Amino acid sequence: AALAVLDALAVLFLSGRLLPSAVAARLPARAAGTAAILLTLALIAPQPAAAQDQPVDEFLAAALKTRLAYVLTGDDLIDETSHAGLVGLTAYLRERTALEPGEPAAIDLTSDELVFYSFLYWPVTADAQVPPADIMAKVDTFMKTGGTIVFDTRDAGGAITPGLFTASEETERLREILAFVDVPPLEPVPPDHVLTKAFYLLSEFPGRWRGSDLWVESLSEDPQAGDRPARGGDGVSPIIITGNDMAAAWAVSADGRYLYPTVPSDPRQREMAYRSGVNIVMYTLTGNYKADQVHIPALLERLGQ
């Protein structure tokens, strides 16, 4: 187990995930390799008893098992809903896909490391405290080094829809939070985006509500792409924004009962909410895989010619 952890750390270090992005960009490959060796030697050296008392099991779980994660807000009901939602989505992923995530992880932004996660669900509340600048710097680094955050304002999309004269309190809070990170231009998911095809074929991404668009990093037009069936695979959007209260649609009790009704009450809407969650998770984990896969018919046709 210890060797597996060291191997995982070495991979993360060499990829720059354990370094600030500015440092990683300037670090030569040879220096990175040397640093990784020194890091390994330091970790396998005998440590004082106090250091050995660290929660190794928790570290192993984060490093060696894919886990969906959510941000703790301090609101017990919201946090319980986030946990129950990711439990429900995890169970759905295990049942319908080859992915078998571990138990969802609750993330305290002030103390927990983000480097081990690719998917982070962040419900935004009207009374949320904007994290301090140093914490948001950590969030910004996470987003710039391969992580994706799903911000959910849970307000049915009234917050984000263009043309509204007033935004919801949740959206105003989200804007204050995002002021501390480098947010790319955003757009509603276009019909040809890989998110619409990452696992299921989808035309919308509902949650408990269904009035909100799903916003992602805007894709630049590629004049050489032609009539491509999917775009957006090469670079995974570091930020996804919805107002559809996704976690509430996914949330299940310990005995498997749904905790919240969809609005309107429609079993099909809940099924589509789960499928939306699957596509988002697969997109954050696989990136351009599905964008390549959907081109296979065209490639085979050209090979035949």
Task: Go through each PLM region and give its residues.
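C-terminal signal-anchor/stop-transfer transmembrane helix together with its immediate cytosolic
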Residues: 1-51
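Extracellular/periplasmic catalytic domains that process cell-envelope and extracellular macromolecules
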Residues: 60-63, 112-116, 135, 142-144, ...
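A generic secondary-structure signal for well-formed alpha-helical elements
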Residues: 13, 97, 147, 178-185, ...
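Aromatic-Pro/Gly-enriched surface loop or interdomain linker
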Residues: 51-119, 126, 246-247, 254-256, ...
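An acidic, glycine-rich "communication" segment
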Residues: 64-67, 157-257, 263-274, 278, ...
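Helical hinge/lid and interdomain linker segments adjacent to catalytic or ligand-binding clefts
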Residues: 77-169, 211, 242
